From Swiss-Prot:
Quaternary structure note: NDH is composed of at least 16 different subunits, 5 of which are encoded in the nucleus.
GO biological process: ATP synthesis coupled electron transport; photosynthesis, light reaction
The species this protein was found in: Helianthus annuus
Coiled-coil zones: none
Source species, domain of life: Eukaryota
Protein name per UniProt: NAD(P)H-quinone oxidoreductase subunit 4L, chloroplastic
Reactions listed under catalytic activity: a plastoquinone + NADH + (n+1) H(+)(in) = a plastoquinol + NAD(+) + n H(+)(out); a plastoquinone + NADPH + (n+1) H(+)(in) = a plastoquinol + NADP(+) + n H(+)(out)
InterPro entries (alphabetical): NADH_UbQ_OxRdtase_chain4L/K, NUOK/Mnh_C1-like
Length: 101
């Protein structure tokens, strides 16, 4: 694939994730949109690594680290969401006012 096609795809994924993160009222949907943004960034890392120097795998290795961090972030985020759901019976972001007390 050409570099421009991959960059357009990555920009589209990033913009959809950013739009979903801004407009989302559900915590789980916001986490999914954040993962979509991170996947767009990973796609850029791998694409530029392949485009500039295909012999070295620096972009691919860095994207593996980002995937590992994103998996940990998703696990912690889902644990927090399930804890809030058990206490508040809702996963809506605007109803979660835990810091007001």
């Amino acid at each position: 694939m050409m570099l421009e096609h991959v960059l357009v795809l990555s920009a589209y994924l990033f913009s959809v994730g950013l739009y979903g993160l801004i407009t989302s009222r559900n915590m789980v949907r916001a986490l999914m949109c954040l993962e979509l943004i991170l996947n767009a960034v990973n796609l850029n890392f791998v694409t530029f690594s392949d485009f500039f120097d295909s012999r070295q795998l620096k972009g691919a290795i860095f994207s593996i680290f980002v995937i590992a961090i994103a998996a940990a972030e998703a696990a912690i985020g889902l644990a927090i969401v399930s804890s809030i759901y058990r206490n508040r019976k809702s996963t809506r972001i605007n109803q979660s006012n835990l810091l007001n007390k």
